[in-house]
Regions:
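A short acidic (Asp/Glu
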Residues: 18-19, 78-81, 106-108
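Non-catalytic, charged low-complexity extensions flanking SF2 helicase motor domains
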Residues: 145-157
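Extended, non-globular alpha-helical segments
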Residues: 38-61, 122-123, 130-148
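Conserved beta-strand-loop-alpha-helix hinge of the TIR/SEFIR fold
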Residues: 59-89, 93-103
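Residues that flank catalytic or metal-binding motifs in active/ligand-binding sites
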Residues: 3, 90, 116
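Conserved nucleotide-binding/hydrolysis micro-motifs of P-loop NTPases
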Residues: 12-14, 101-104
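Glycine-rich, charge-decorated loop segments at or immediately adjacent to ligand/cofactor-binding or catalytic sites
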Residues: 102-123
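Conserved N-terminal substructure of TIR/SEFIR domains
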Residues: 1-62, 158-200
Length: 200
C-alpha cells in the first residue's frame, strides 16, 4: 500500500544520501514530503523559527508515515527533533533508517549516528525507539523493503491512541546502536514506527 511519507534528515550532511533514498522510487514523487531545494531552505531559515515550523507542519499534512533517515549527526539536529515530535503526536507512524552506509558522491560511507528516537518517550515512560522499528538502508535492503516498513510503522502507530503523545526523554536513556548485520530491525519491547527528511 502506497503511503504519503515525510522524510526527516540532516540536510547539510546527508542530503546526498537522502536523495538516493528519494530516487529509489519506492515512494512515488507525489507521495514524498520534506525534500526542499537548498536555496528555498535558506530562504525559509532567514524568516526565523516560526517560518520553519510552519513549513514542517505544512509538509506533514496528509502524510501518515515519517521516515527518519539517520546519519552521523541526525540525532542532534533541532529540526529533526521537532519533526519527530510533531509526527508522532499528529498520528504518523515512524520508522528509523540508518543511511550512513550509502556511498556519497565521492563513493565514501559515513559513521553511524545514534537513533534520535532514543530521545523521546511515551506518557507511560516507554522509550520511542523500543516502539518504532529501525533498519539500515543498505544492510536491510531499503530499496526493496521501504514500502513494507512504512506499512509496519502505520500499523504500529494505530495501536496507540491519539492521546498517547510523546515528549523528550531525559539524557540518561541508554542509546541503541545501528544494526551491524542484516536483520528485521531491533527486537521491540512494544511495536515500532516511520517517515520524513530533515535539514540543517
Amino acid at each position: 500500500m502506497a503511503r504519503k511519507t515525510f522524510f526527516s534528515f540532516h540536510y547539510e550532511r546527508d542530503v546526498w544520501r537522502a536523495s538516493q533514498v528519494r530516487n529509489s522510487n519506492v515512494v512515488s514523487k507525489e507521495d514524498q514530503y520534506g525534500f526542499i531545494d537548498a536555496a528555498d531552505w535558506e530562504s525559509i531559515k532567514k524568516k526565523g523559527d516560526t517560518a520553519i515550523q510552519n513549513w514542517i507542519n505544512d509538509q506533514l499534512k496528509n502524510t501518515s508515515v515519517t521516515a527518519v533517515l539517520i546519519g552521523a549527526e541526525t540525532a542532534d539536529r533541532e529540526w529533526v527533533q521537532y519533526e519527530i515530535l510533531q509526527s508522532w503526536n499528529r498520528g504518523n507512524g515512524i520508522v528509523a533508517i540508518w543511511i550512513h552506509n550509502i556511498k556519497d558522491q565521492k563513493q565514501k560511507t559515513d559513521i553511524a549516528g545514534r537513533n534520535p528516537l532514543d530521545d523521546f518517550k511515551l506518557s507511560n515512560g516507554t522509550i520511542l525507539s523500543s516502539v518504532c522499528k529501525a533498519y539500515d538502508w543498505v544492510i536491510n535492503d531499503g530499496r526493496k523493503n521501504l514500502g513494507k516498513w512504512a506499512d509496519e510503522a502505520a500499523e504500529i502507530r494505530a495501536k496507540y491512541g491519539s492521546d498517547d503523545k510523546i515528549k523528550r526523554a531525559n539524557e540518561s536513556v541508554k542509546k541503541a546502536q545501528a544494526p551491524a548485520t542484516a536483520s528485521a530491525g531491533f527486537a521491540p519491547r512494544s511495536p515500532w514506527c516511520s517517515q520524513y527528511a530533515e535539514r540543517d
